[in-house]
UniProtKB/Swiss-Prot annotation:
Designated name of the protein: Large ribosomal subunit protein uL5
Record bears the keyword Endoplasmic reticulum: no
One CC-aspect GO term: ribonucleoprotein complex
The entry's keywords: Ribonucleoprotein, Ribosomal protein, RNA-binding, rRNA-binding, tRNA-binding
Swiss-Prot/TrEMBL GO biological process terms: translation
Taxonomy, superkingdom: Bacteria
Upper classification of the organism: Bacteria, Bacillati, Bacillota, Clostridia, Thermoanaerobacterales
GO molecular function: rRNA binding; structural constituent of ribosome; tRNA binding
Organism from which the protein derives: Caldanaerobacter subterraneus subsp. tengcongensis (strain DSM 15242 / JCM 11007 / NBRC 100824 / MB4)
């Protein structure tokens, strides 16, 4: 069992039950999944870029990403429906806990001028979205092997009903929120 999952079961659950007055352990919010998405805008001119993004994401997440395709054609962006425009991966269970542990304790502190993540990025339903500007903050990515600095979106989906509950959950798990 991963470190973060153990922390959740031993420390976070009792703390949340006390703070929000849950009667049943099943009411306590928990992490459902983490979705990591890399939008590859240059995929239409450069098919190799999609492959490179896939490899980066595979190394970061430890899981094979799936290619996302355009839902509809947009002439301004010169994309047609069905064209590959990015890669994403959905992590659940152990892999999710391991990824978040790595994100909170290793990757985020490596961001330049890092003062904490914004506490305003919740969506109103207890999910958190985080944008990362470069994939280099992850220890698995070798600086010499990347073709281009790529950002990514990390969405943390929880079972919390409100943003307040979700923030408490993530804070107790060790998410470094800005003060």
């Amino acid at each position: 069992m991963s470190r973060l999952r153990e922390k959740y079961e031993k420390e976070v659950v009792p703390a949340l039950m006390e703070r929000f007055g849950y009667k049943n352990i099943m009411q306590v919010p928990k992490l459902e999944k983490v979705v990591i998405n890399i939008g590859v805008g240059e995929a239409k001119e450069n098919p190799k870029a999609l492959e490179a993004a896939m490899n980066d994401l595979m190394m970061i997440s430890g899981q094979k990403p799936v290619i996302t395709r355009a839902k509809k054609s947009i002439s301004n962006f010169k994309i047609r429906k069905g064209m590959p425009i990015g890669v994403k991966v959905t992590l659940r269970r152990e892999r999710m806990y391991e990824f978040l542990d790595k994100l909170f304790n290793i990757a985020l502190p490596r961001v330049r001028d890092f003062k904490g993540v914004s506490p305003n990025s919740f969506d109103g339903r207890g999910n958190y979205a985080l944008g990362v500007r470069e994939q280099l903050i992850f220890p698995e990515i070798d600086y010499d092997k990347i073709d281009k600095v790529r950002g990514m979106d990390i969405i943390i989906v929880t079972t919390a009903k409100t943003d307040e509950e979700a923030k408490a959950l993530l804070e107790l798990l060790g998410m470094p929120f800005a003060k």
